[in-house]
Regions:
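Active-site microenvironments in enzyme catalytic cores
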Residues: 1-169, 177-181
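Acidic, glycine-rich active-site loops and adjacent beta-strand->loop/helix elements
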Residues: 27, 88, 205, 249-250
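Exposed beta-sheet edge/beta-hairpin loop segments within beta-rich domains
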Residues: 45-49, 190-191, 234
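Hydrophobic alpha-helical scaffolding
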Residues: 103, 172, 230-233
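Acidic, low-complexity intrinsically disordered regions
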Residues: 170-171, 265
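Active-site pocket scaffolds in enzymes
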Residues: 177-185, 192-195, 199-248, 254-266
């Protein structure tokens, strides 16, 4: 679908929850919820469209008191570091429930993070320019300097007892809105942040089809299935598939790895 009118004007987001954030190697159970096919009544059933979303998560220090905002110029002073982040989604549940208040059961069943947090200080050699933003952003979202980061990202799908197949090769530098802008927008109304708060970047998709950061895009909403090395096809993630995300930065003789976040999808419970 075309971007909504607000997408080029503000970093669209929503508040989540911490209770179902899990680390690498913790399996994810296929969720159930309401789905609806056009012309039919809603059904309560297991989601048939489980998707990964390739993201980075950034972690904050304690922020300012409630009622005070953080500017883009000072935002990185409040960011401790980053990890890999798989923001699981149930697309069919999401499609029915998200209007008008946004996703709920489609997102809160699990979010997976890698075990390593790389500090923002360590990432400074990999700072790059943010993509050109048109139209010009509002004053509180303007910034100076290099606020994006060159982080190479990969996603693999591994069927049960099968090989890992890379399905996505992307980069954090493709993000339209940088972290400083995201944090400035998050706090512009006076919302406070606390030490250890986790902010998801949003899906990281690049300019080419192999850099799209979700199955929704890679398989084009199921109309262009991916073929794995064993000959099987994927429109979305199947039971017992393992989704693996990896990330690293490299610059001459310097290489910093983010490790990986590895999560297997298990069948829905009765």
């Amino acid at each position: 679908n075309a971007l909504l009118p607000n997408w080029l004007w503000l970093p669209v987001g929503y508040h989540g929850r911490s209770s179902s954030i899990i680390t690498s190697e913790v399996p994810v159970v296929r969720p159930k919820g309401q789905t609806k096919v056009e012309g039919e009544n809603p059904k309560f059933e297991a989601s048939a469209r489980i998707d990964f979303e390739l993201e980075m998560g950034f972690y904050t220090f304690d922020g300012k008191p409630l009622g005070e905002r953080i500017s883009t110029a000072e935002a990185e002073d409040f960011i401790f570091g980053l990890s890999l982040f798989n923001d699981w989604s149930a697309r069919d549940i999401q499609q029915w429930e998200y209007v008008p208040l946004g996703p709920f059961l489609a997102k809160n069943f699990a979010s997976s993070i890698s075990p390593w947090i790389i500090t923002l200080d360590a990432l400074q050699p990999f700072a790059v320019d943010t993509p050109v933003q048109e139209p010009a952003v509002l004053p509180y979202l303007k910034f100076e300097g290099k606020k994006s980061y060159d982080i190479n990202l990969e996603v693999f799908i591994q069927p049960k007892d099968g090989a890992e197949d890379r399905v996505c090769l992307s980069n954090f530098k493709y993000m339209y809105w940088n972290m400083a802008q995201q944090l400035a927008h998050h706090t512009v109304n006076g919302c406070n942040i606390r030490c250890g708060d986790l902010m998801g970047s949003g899906t990281i998709s690049g300019p080419t089809p192999d850099s799209y950061g979700s199955m929704l895009e890679l398989a084009w909403k199921g109309t262009k299935p991916l073929t794995l090395s064993d000959g099987s096809q994927r429109r979305f993630i199947q039971d017992y598939d393992t989704v693996i995300m990896k990330g690293h930065c490299t610059n001459g003789n310097i290489r910093i790895g983010f490790g990986e976040v590895r999560s297997q999808l298990l069948p829905a419970q009765d």
